[in-house]
A protein has these predicted regions:
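Conserved catalytic submotifs in the C-terminal HATPase_c
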Residues: 8-10, 48, 100
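Short beta->alpha connector loops at strand-helix junctions that form conserved
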Residues: 17, 100-101
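Amphipathic alpha-helical interaction surfaces in cytosolic regulatory modules
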Residues: 19-97
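Absolute protein N-terminus
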Residues: 1-2, 101
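STAS-typified acidic loop motif
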Residues: 2-30
Length: 101
Protein backbone atom coordinates (compact mmCIF):
# COMPACT_ATOMS: atom_id res chain seq x y z
CA UNK A 1 0.00 0.00 0.00
CA UNK A 2 1.10 3.51 -0.78
CA UNK A 3 -0.62 6.67 0.36
CA UNK A 4 -0.48 10.41 0.10
CA UNK A 5 -2.55 13.07 1.82
CA UNK A 6 -4.00 16.35 0.67
CA UNK A 7 -5.56 19.09 2.74
CA UNK A 8 -9.23 19.80 2.11
CA UNK A 9 -11.36 22.59 3.54
CA UNK A 10 -12.31 20.78 6.75
CA UNK A 11 -9.80 17.95 6.99
CA UNK A 12 -7.74 15.57 4.87
CA UNK A 13 -8.12 13.35 1.84
CA UNK A 14 -5.98 10.22 1.92
CA UNK A 15 -5.25 8.56 -1.42
CA UNK A 16 -4.56 4.85 -0.93
CA UNK A 17 -3.15 2.80 -3.80
CA UNK A 18 -2.10 -0.79 -4.35
CA UNK A 19 -2.98 -3.71 -2.10
CA UNK A 20 -4.07 -3.01 1.48
CA UNK A 21 -3.18 -5.97 3.72
CA UNK A 22 -2.06 -6.85 7.22
CA UNK A 23 1.52 -5.89 6.45
CA UNK A 24 0.34 -2.28 6.02
CA UNK A 25 -0.85 -1.86 9.60
CA UNK A 26 2.06 0.40 10.66
CA UNK A 27 1.49 2.63 7.66
CA UNK A 28 -2.25 2.77 8.28
CA UNK A 29 -1.73 3.80 11.90
CA UNK A 30 0.23 6.80 10.58
CA UNK A 31 -2.96 7.73 8.73
CA UNK A 32 -5.10 7.20 11.83
CA UNK A 33 -2.87 9.67 13.66
CA UNK A 34 -4.44 12.34 11.42
CA UNK A 35 -7.65 11.80 13.39
CA UNK A 36 -5.89 12.90 16.54
CA UNK A 37 -5.23 16.42 15.29
CA UNK A 38 -7.81 18.85 16.57
CA UNK A 39 -8.40 20.52 13.22
CA UNK A 40 -9.59 17.44 11.31
CA UNK A 41 -13.39 17.35 10.98
CA UNK A 42 -13.55 15.15 7.88
CA UNK A 43 -11.33 12.37 6.58
CA UNK A 44 -11.81 11.02 3.08
CA UNK A 45 -10.23 7.70 2.16
CA UNK A 46 -9.86 7.82 -1.61
CA UNK A 47 -9.60 4.20 -2.72
CA UNK A 48 -9.71 4.77 -6.47
CA UNK A 49 -6.16 3.37 -6.69
CA UNK A 50 -6.67 0.49 -4.26
CA UNK A 51 -6.97 -2.83 -6.08
CA UNK A 52 -7.13 -5.30 -3.16
CA UNK A 53 -8.09 -5.33 0.52
CA UNK A 54 -7.93 -8.27 2.93
CA UNK A 55 -9.74 -8.83 6.22
CA UNK A 56 -6.98 -7.08 8.18
CA UNK A 57 -7.37 -4.02 5.96
CA UNK A 58 -11.10 -4.03 6.63
CA UNK A 59 -10.40 -4.31 10.34
CA UNK A 60 -8.16 -1.26 10.22
CA UNK A 61 -11.01 0.72 8.68
CA UNK A 62 -13.16 -0.34 11.66
CA UNK A 63 -10.47 0.96 14.02
CA UNK A 64 -10.39 4.25 12.10
CA UNK A 65 -14.18 4.46 12.40
CA UNK A 66 -14.06 3.94 16.17
CA UNK A 67 -11.38 6.61 16.57
CA UNK A 68 -13.26 9.08 14.36
CA UNK A 69 -16.60 8.45 16.03
CA UNK A 70 -15.15 9.30 19.44
CA UNK A 71 -14.08 12.69 18.03
CA UNK A 72 -17.15 13.37 15.84
CA UNK A 73 -15.08 13.24 12.65
CA UNK A 74 -16.91 12.48 9.41
CA UNK A 75 -15.45 9.57 7.45
CA UNK A 76 -15.91 9.01 3.72
CA UNK A 77 -14.89 6.18 1.40
CA UNK A 78 -14.44 7.64 -2.07
CA UNK A 79 -13.80 5.96 -5.40
CA UNK A 80 -13.76 2.33 -4.24
CA UNK A 81 -14.13 0.10 -7.29
CA UNK A 82 -14.49 -3.53 -8.28
CA UNK A 83 -13.80 -6.16 -5.65
CA UNK A 84 -12.69 -3.58 -3.08
CA UNK A 85 -16.08 -1.86 -3.27
CA UNK A 86 -17.94 -5.18 -3.43
CA UNK A 87 -16.33 -6.56 -0.26
CA UNK A 88 -16.82 -3.28 1.63
CA UNK A 89 -20.51 -3.20 0.75
CA UNK A 90 -20.97 -6.93 1.43
CA UNK A 91 -19.54 -6.39 4.93
CA UNK A 92 -21.84 -3.38 5.48
CA UNK A 93 -19.17 -0.70 5.62
CA UNK A 94 -21.83 1.62 4.23
CA UNK A 95 -23.25 1.62 7.77
CA UNK A 96 -19.95 3.02 9.10
CA UNK A 97 -18.81 5.27 6.26
CA UNK A 98 -20.41 7.53 3.69
CA UNK A 99 -19.62 6.16 0.23
CA UNK A 100 -18.95 8.50 -2.69
CA UNK A 101 -18.11 7.68 -6.29
Amino acid sequence: MNYKTEDIADGKEVFISGSFTFRDHDTFFEIISLLKTGSCKKLIFNLSGCDFIDSAGLGMFVIAHDEAESKSIELVIKGAQGKVRDVMLATRFDSLYTFEN
